[in-house]
UniProtKB/Swiss-Prot annotation:
Disulfide bonds: none annotated. One of its GO terms (molecular function) is hydrolase activity. It comes from Thermococcus kodakarensis (strain ATCC BAA-918 / JCM 12380 / KOD1). Belongs to the UPF0282 family. It holds the Pfam family Lactamase_B_2. InterPro entries: Metallo-B-lactamas (IPR001279), RibonucZ/Hydroxyglut_hydro (IPR036866), UPF0173_UPF0282_UlaG_hydrolase (IPR050114), UPF0282_hydrls (IPR014426). This is UPF0282 protein TK1681. The lineage of its organism: Archaea, Methanobacteriati, Methanobacteriota, Thermococci, Thermococcales.
Length: 299
């Protein structure tokens, strides 16, 4: 099995897009990239927009290779919509390239879903149904694909129990020699997802941390995230790739320091420098204006 992290906050955009080659199958997980439209009251800096285009180009390249596409939920950093979006670098052509002729395993569009995501799922399916090879609603189901098993969790909260952001599905890929779980946007904040991960006992866990950058709206999420991920590490001894929401917080290295086994970011797994652009948006705007500011990465 070969696991290739594609795009994430440590690579400069909002995403957790991943490509997996297993048993002759080529699987693209959560094919979306986006930028936060506002952070510190500021729009994306120029370097963020440039990086978004680079990540879109990379995502489309891997989409052309994929046989299977999985979608954990309908936020635009996890799937590419069929409209032209500046901060999603999206278009109908990009979407068609990703989904046409592919087998799609997707979060159920009408069950365990909030109003916003239900609307997005409807818009997605209105376009995708005509071009996909096959579409399966994946929640809680398992698929045997000739030596490779792809298993999906039941719908679990997007974050803490009772979250207004809706639900997501996690995916396990097992080729008989390695078990990989991609646990998108669980934020390590609900017991259902933690129990499912421990029960499935992965060799590698790819997940997003808590949204500690939200400040008072995320009170207690740091402690809960550390506790839950440490439990997963101790129970499974999985290698962990941790990225996404937590890397929007400049303090994310301190979060990593509190874990029983230090995870890698997407950038770290790829052996390149972390470039958490959104976390340093204030500094990036100052640099672009010629004002004095420093960031802990190369521009």
């Amino acid at each position: 099995m070969r696991v290739i992290p594609l795009a994430s906050e440590s690579l400069g955009v909002r995403s957790l897009a991943t490509f997996v080659e297993a048993g002759g199958l080529r699987i693209l997980i959560d094919p979306g990239v986006a930028l936060g439209p506002k952070r510190y009251g500021l729009p994306p800096a120029e370097v963020e927009l440039k990086t978004l285009q680079q990540m879109r180009k990379k995502l489309q390249g891997y989409a052309r290779k994929a046989d299977i596409v999985t979608i954990s939920h309908y936020h635009y950093d996890h799937h590419t919509p069929f409209f032209e979006g500046l901060y999603e670098s999206s278009s109908e052509d990009y979407a068609r390239e990703i989904y046409a002729g592919k087998i799609l395993f997707i979060k159920h569009p009408t069950e365990n879903i909030n109003f916003s995501q239900r609307k997005r799922a409807w818009a997605f399916l209105k376009n995708a149904e005509a071009i996909a090879k096959k579409i399966e609603y994946a929640d809680g189901r398992s698929f045997d694909l000739g030596g490779v098993t792809i298993e999906f969790s039941p719908a679990v909260p997007h974050g803490s129990e009772g979250s207004k952001l809706g639900f997501v599905v996690m995916v396990l890929i097992d080729d008989g020699s390695k078990r990989v779980i991609h646990a998108s946007d669980i934020q390590l904040l609900n017991r259902r997802s933690v129990k499912w991960i421990i029960e499935k006992n992965p060799d590698l866990l790819i997940t997003g941390g808590p949204p500690t950058y939200l400040g008072p709206r995320a009170t207690g999420s740091w402690e809960t995230g550390v506790k839950n991920l440490n439990e997963i590490i101790l129970e499974t001894n999985a290698e962990v790739i941790l990225d996404h929401h937590i890397v929007r917080d400049k303090r994310y290295p301190e979060f990593f320091d509190e874990l029983e086994k230090r995870p890698k970011t997407f950038a770290g797994y790829l052996k390149v420098e972390d470039r958490p652009l959104e976390a340093y948006r204030r500094e990036l705007h100052k640099i672009e204006k010629g004002e004095g500011a420093e960031v802990p990465f190369r521009l």
